[in-house]
Amino acid sequence: MRFDVITLFPEFLAQSAGLGVVGRAREKGLFSLHGWNPRDYAEGNYRRVDDRPFGGGPGMVMLIEPLQACLQAIRDADPTPARVIHLSPQGAPLTQAKVRELAALPRMVLLCGRYEGIDERFLEANVDEEISLGDYVLSGGELGAAVIIDAVARLQDGALNDAESAAQDSFEGDLGLLDCPHYSQPAQHPLGDVPEVLRSGNHAAIAAWRRQQSLVRTAQRRPDLLDEQALGKADRKLLDQARQAQKQKASP
């Protein structure tokens, strides 16, 4: 996997991709990261990459020429086809399903805008898709690029010490449920004890408890993710049992 990032702050991406799981994956050679600053491809003494918008209004707009030259340099550096992704609040929301799709690509170019945005002509001519982190606005696309790099890199084969870790994450699995609660030592603590079933050694019971907790959490915290009509009999039974137990606990 190769990431090429067009950004005015390439050092930011290099630093964020050097930490934790992602940093270790990079050291293993599971992906490469290349930052490209459009200012390096701007002409004139001031290396200008922005100008005022036609029609007036606040802010500045990133210019076509430096971006086009930067993108051409990226394509010249490696013949591998690359999907060009613009990080924008106008894009489709980033989901785990999209992350899995991106993780299967050999290469992508992440375009990070700044100021009021990028000249629309450049976007229409070069961008394959736009992705958003959510319905809010950031100072630039770098944080979005860092999120995509992190999410995609950890899915590369060998990135995680235990491959099952990714399979058990929230939004993974057959229904895309939220993850279940996790506990570690000590078993007993003033803040509460670890559920007895997790200490029982009964793997079937533990699996059923974890599945039930995932169902309950998804129903309570992200009901938009749970299609109860699509649940199988076993899942429906687990969810009904949990709801019944909650009602009994709440009753005087």
Curated annotation (Swiss-Prot):
Entry's Gene Ontology cellular component terms: cytosol
Subcellular location, record wording: Cytoplasm
Top-level taxonomic group: Bacteria
Binding-site residues for S-adenosyl-L-methionine, renumbered to this chain: 113, 133-138
GO-annotated biological processes: tRNA N1-guanine methylation
Catalytic activity: guanosine(37) in tRNA + S-adenosyl-L-methionine = N(1)-methylguanosine(37) in tRNA + S-adenosyl-L-homocysteine + H(+)
GO molecular function, one term: tRNA (guanine(37)-N1)-methyltransferase activity
Keyword vocabulary terms for this entry: Cytoplasm, Methyltransferase, S-adenosyl-L-methionine, Transferase, tRNA processing
Family recorded in the similarity comment: Belongs to the RNA methyltransferase TrmD family.
PANTHER family: TRNA (GUANINE-N(1)-)-METHYLTRANSFERASE (PTHR46417:SF1)
Subunit structure: Homodimer.
Biological role: Specifically methylates guanosine-37 in various tRNAs.
Protein name in UniProt: tRNA (guanine-N(1)-)-methyltransferase
Gene behind this protein: trmD
